[in-house]
Amino acid sequence: GIPIVQTLKESLTGNRITSLEGILNGTGNYILSEMTSKGVSFAPALAEAQEKGYAEADPTLDIDGFDTAHKLVLLIRLAWGVDYPYTKMPIEGIRNLDKMDIDFAREFGYRIKLLGRARMRDGKLEAGVFPTLVNHTYLLARVGGAYNAVRVEGNAVGSLFLHGLGAGSLPTASAVLGDLISIARQNNKLN
């Protein structure tokens, strides 16, 4: 996965984060990318994601937005130090999108992306997960396949964009290994 956790924990500690948004689930993005690029409906795109090992046999967490919501909760905790349960946010997945939705968006110059979004507005945190119309010229609209991307807005750094492979065995193994090394380093500091 992309190094967003370490970025928020270490690199952006001198910033006041104002917003973050991103494609936090590579499986969902792969499905939407297939629907957009190949003109297929949801079911064949999901079947292909499963065949390639991007989607689980039971893809509920990915396609209903809950995996994105769980990741967004973690990013909110790191960015604002707030415990924000996913049950508090609106969550809508991509299960009910069809080819007509994709075609309609494209006709008007948009792509549909499953985004997790959070922002601090007037001292109040707003967050949610939903399929979003994204202008085709915007960076997030150009993220295809099983890739993830996160845009973070900070008062000092401005806009920061991180992008990388987000589904499959290698990115998952890389993220787990990175977490284990981070934990081991932290334990060494404590001893």
Model regions and ranges:
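Rossmann-like NAD(P)H-binding beta-loop-alpha module
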Residues: 1-55, 65-67, 74
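Conserved active-site and cofactor/substrate-binding residues in soluble primary-metabolism enzymes
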Residues: 3, 15, 37-44, 63-71, ...
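Solvent-exposed alpha-helices and their adjacent loops that cap or buttress functional pockets
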Residues: 10-16, 22-24, 38, 119-122, ...
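A short glycine-threonine-serine/GTX helix/turn-capping micro-motif
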Residues: 18-20, 56-63, 162-167
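Short helix-capping/linker segments at secondary-structure and domain boundaries
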Residues: 38-41, 79-86, 182-190
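Substrate-binding/catalytic subdomain of NAD(P)-dependent oxidoreductase enzymes
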Residues: 46-149
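ATP-dependent carboxylate/acyl-activation modules
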Residues: 138-191
